């Protein structure tokens, strides 16, 4: 009888653990699907740096990555964040805005300038933003500056 109870408990816990592994796998897959960079193709516009985080893994770590978002049609940095949250909603991923600024994007010159700050979210780490932008714009000159709004 004790063996039967132990076997049932093992099966129950095994199924639970398999379910957890599946959730983490789904979370990792969802995280992998989030593009690192989504900015307008040209112009000067506000941008934000966001940390996207998956579910905590069995070893206690939380998989995450930094993403850059910037759109000319968003009047406020908060508008960019809301749009991004809307695209991630329902995936089980969490987001945190780490700050913002502006981007000047000139595709003819293959040039990006990352500068300024967000009044609401503070200044993003422009060096980190540059690192993320380089994943998409490998052959661009990317300048960073703490000057300007």
UniProtKB/Swiss-Prot annotation:
Question: Is-annotated flag, keyword Manganese?
Answer: no
Annotated binding of substrate, by residue:
46, 118-120
**Keywords, in A-Z order:** Differentiation, Sexual differentiation
Q: Note the InterPro entries from the entry.
A: Janus, Janus_sf
Q: Which residues form the active site?
A: 77 (proton acceptor)
Bilayer-crossing residues are none
- GO CC: one term? cytosol
Keyword tRNA processing in record = no
Segment forming the signal sequence: none
In terms of SUPFAM superfamilies, this protein maps to: PHP14-like
Highest taxon listed in the record's lineage = Eukaryota
MF terms in GO: protein histidine phosphatase activity
Q: Name one GO biological process term.
A: sex differentiation
- What does this protein's UniProt record list under function? JanA and janB regulate somatic sex differentiation.
Similarity field = Belongs to the janus family.
Q: What is this protein called?
A: Sex-regulated protein janus-A
């Amino acid at each position: 009888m004790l063996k039967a109870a132990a076997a049932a408990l093992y099966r129950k816990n095994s199924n639970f653990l398999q379910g957890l592994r599946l959730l983490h796998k789904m979370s990792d897959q969802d995280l992998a699907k989030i593009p690192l960079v989504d900015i307008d193709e040209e112009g000067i516009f506000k941008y934000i740096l966001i940390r996207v985080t998956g579910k905590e893994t069995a070893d206690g770590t939380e998989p995450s990555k930094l993403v850059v978002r910037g759109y000319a049609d968003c009047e406020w940095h908060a508008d960019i964040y809301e749009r991004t949250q809307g695209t991630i909603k329902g995936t089980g991923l969490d987001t945190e805005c780490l700050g913002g600024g502006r981007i000047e994007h000139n595709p003819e010159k293959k040039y990006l300038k990352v500068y300024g700050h967000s009044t609401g979210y503070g200044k993003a780490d422009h060096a980190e933003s540059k690192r993320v932008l380089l994943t998409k714009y490998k052959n661009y000159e990317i300048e960073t500056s703490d000057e300007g709004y």
